[in-house]
């Protein structure tokens, strides 16, 4: 029986989606998973190929992958992605698009298997070192990682590229060669083509030693997670915001570790030391009457009520009006704010036949809301209800004609209150 080189202890799941580029590494991975399936007939195996459109050979690569999967009786999903310039660089953007496609393709109960190996681990470590990363970044890749509500497995992570080549030759496998892999303008290619061969010539076991260092860094991070668990419980609210008061008495090092872990929990990119310092100085310690904001790509960190918030950047909609001619059907909101709909059963009256329905994001004058005596301006209501400033001109306001009826999830006006049991509710799916 052929001895598999992949780490079969990872393969407890019986439903596997294999990332399959058609290159050497993923071909060996898929071949070994096919052999694994032969030994375990209850295993369901699929493959996914990402068509980036970056190479003139991309279509022929799809045909190659289809041929291989047909021969091995593996259902293949081909996903075409479009790469736009978002400032990340082509490598990072291609990876982001690739993993987004993986997440969208995974079925319930399915795990993702990718073909990274020991040499890839070494490259990842050195790239993190070049960026000045700490232990978290230097932990590189784990054999098992959370991903899209399931797991990402790297069963070949302990094997060298040479081992995979030997397997492929011994079993007569065919694979494609991506011409971009020979372009040392890319950092990872530079390491693989130029730097690592020199290092391995001097120290043959260099990749294995680097992998051990990555493992030690990962262990240190897990230890820190354990030691800081009670701090995180004290600092993080049920809404996922970060309380500032417990951080004030912490050492700089401890506070930075808490900030990093909070951002990781919000799926934010790992911040540099300079970024952490800016978060603390420019946002956390800003004047009490300020509304500080620090942008990170398409997200931002803000302070409100002595808490830090990690939020998606959304342009204010202060001047926007969205007509809702058929209020019985859901309405799409601008700027990625989601949808609203009026559903039967609730405390809002239905619109009268002569009343037009619209969604707006500002309301002038003095307002009277249900459950409160006296009138207030909208700004005062937002403050009383604890609505953060950045949500005040992105929260949908329901109007019948020129009359404000309700703010989604916040309040109902007296003019909008239902007088019978035929009321409706304004539901906002953000």
UniProtKB/Swiss-Prot annotation:
Ligand binding (ATP): 21-26
Localization of this protein: Cytoplasm
Superkingdom per UniProt: Bacteria
Family as reported in the entry's similarity comment: Belongs to the tRNA(Ile)-lysidine synthase family.
EC number: 6.3.4.19
Origin species: Salmonella typhimurium (strain LT2 / SGSC1412 / ATCC 700720)
GO cellular component terms, A-Z: cytoplasm
GO BP terms in the entry: tRNA modification
Gene that encodes the chain: tilS
Species classification: Bacteria, Pseudomonadati, Pseudomonadota, Gammaproteobacteria, Enterobacterales
Protein name: tRNA(Ile)-lysidine synthase
One Pfam assignment: TilS
Molecular function in Gene Ontology: ATP binding; tRNA(Ile)-lysidine synthase activity
Reaction(s) catalysed (UniProt annotation): cytidine(34) in tRNA(Ile2) + L-lysine + ATP = lysidine(34) in tRNA(Ile2) + AMP + diphosphate + H(+)
Keywords: ATP-binding, Cytoplasm, Ligase, Nucleotide-binding, tRNA processing
Recorded domain comment: The N-terminal region contains the highly conserved SGGXDS motif, predicted to be a P-loop motif involved in ATP binding.
